[in-house]
A protein has these predicted regions:
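Catalytic-site neighborhood detector that most strongly recognizes the C-terminal catalytic loop/helix
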Residues: 312-363
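N-terminal core-binding DNA-recognition domain of tyrosine recombinases/integrases
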Residues: 6-116
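Short basic/aromatic active-site micro-motif
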Residues: 252-256, 271-301, 310, 314
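DNA breakage-rejoining catalytic core of tyrosine-based enzymes
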Residues: 59, 111-130, 203-217, 230
Length: 390
């Protein structure tokens, strides 16, 4: 007979889930097993036996167990968490070829709900400035990157040194050596705005986004520090970072811990909780809130929702996703127009956003606009002539 751990490990391995999903699924299945007072193997054997005996669904213990568990979760958890737990349990049964027929619908009346997170819950620029000021080099770079790129923590953690070299290639002549690339970028007279061609782990959707020069400079400082530490570590045969190394060296658990430490140090508290129903809130300074900050502030400074969705790797609808492809340079121009919204340490008046590429792009846009205006004027003249107005 397999233990709970063995069943969970086999279940997770065949589905190819991430470390974070592994922990979530493991906790949920343990929660279900404890509620039922049986091991997962005993629950599977019971369901399998009932199925082989041809017992009708409405009389099966499995239906009663799932219904009872659903009601328990609804009464003790938020409605979204309750639905997620039941979904995981059903997936587990399906994975072991156990049939599950129709269950009673979730009764959402009087269900526990979180208070909505509102714009006032987002950390303001001054708070983020304080956070960056007191943070260690890794967190300085990470905060500025997440705020200005809008990437999720999962996608940011997946980035490699090679991804960084690719994103900044035009600033270091496509150098494949990190130290050489950093040297050239530090000598570059202008703003370094990387172009990230990435893919969301959550949806497998490819997307393009950018980050600010201040984020790039702090990433460079952080990478130099890591290389320096590698050089001083005599027990490590590796003396510099390679293309396959992670851009941000931080585990999923440590990621949350470091943000919570900063949140607590700044006394930011939580958001989205509901004390009356004993629902704890989320820390205000966390990766997802920085993603919200990115979207909210780009919109505040003139960027449309469609473009924001593109930068965050979100869908703009099935038809748009299939038939419309976003041009990197056009997106970059839109990003630079709204960049003030995601600058944390730099005032926009001091920000030389007119890089050589941008100046060229702006000039071409002006010339294009002049041509359009001229054509429009000519069309209007022809219309008047046709009507006999001239």
């Amino acid at each position: 007979m397999s233990t709970n751990q063995e069943l969970v490990d086999e279940f997770i391995a065949t589905r190819g889930l991430s470390k974070a999903s592994y922990k979530s699924f493991k906790y949920t299945l343990k929660h279900y097993s404890n509620f039922q007072g049986c091991s997962l193997q005993e629950l599977l054997d019971e369901a399998d036996y009932e199925e082989e005996q041809g017992i009708r669904w409405k009389k099966r213990k499995l239906k009663q167990r799932l219904t009872n568990y659903m009601n328990f979760c609804r009464n003790t958890l938020t409605i979204n968490t309750a639905k997620h737990y039941l979904k995981v349990v059903k997936i587990f049964y399906h994975h072991h070829d156990i049939e599950i027929h129709k269950l009673p619908p979730f009764n959402e009346r009087n269900a526990k709900v979180r208070n909505p997170i509102t714009p006032k819950d987002l950390p303001i620029r001054e708070i983020l400035q304080e956070a960056v000021e007191i943070a260690e080099p890794l967190m300085k770079a990470l905060i500025l990157f997440l705020v200005s790129s809008g990437m999720s923590k999962v996608d940011a953690r997946n980035l490699t040194i090679q991804n960084f070299l690719d994103a900044t290639s035009k600033y270091h002549n496509n150098s494949e050596d990190l130290k050489t690339a950093i040297k050239l970028m530090k000598e570059y007279d202008g703003e370094i705005i990387p172009i990230w061609n990435s893919r969301r782990q959550k949806t497998n959707k490819f997307f393009v986004t950018f980050n600010t020069d201040e984020a790039t400079r702090h990433i460079i400082s952080y990478l130099e520090l890591r290389n320096e530490r590698l050089n001083k570590n005599f027990y490590n045969p590796k003396n510099e970072l390679g293309p396959s190394d992670k851009l941000f060296k931080i585990g999923v658990d440590y990621f949350s811990v470091k943000f919570k430490e900063l949140n607590d140090t700044l006394n930011l508290g939580t958001a989205g909780g509901n004390p009356e129903e004993n629902i704890k809130g989320f820390t205000r300074l966390r990766a997802h809130m920085l993603r919200k900050y990115h979207a909210t502030n780009l919109k505040k400074f003139g960027m449309d929702t469609y473009t924001i969705n593109v930068l965050q790797g979100k869908s703009n609808g099935a038809v748009n996703d299939v038939y419309f492809f976003e041009d990197e340079e056009t997106l970059l121009a839109e990003y630079i127009k709204a960049i003030e919204g995601v600058l944390i340490l730099t005032d926009v008046k001091d920000y030389n956003r007119y890089s050589p590429e941008y100046i060229k792009m702006e000039k071409e846009n002006e010339e294009y606009k002049e041509k359009i205006d001229k054509i429009t004027d000519e069309i209007n003249v022809l219309k008047k002539m046709y009507r006999g107005e001239t």
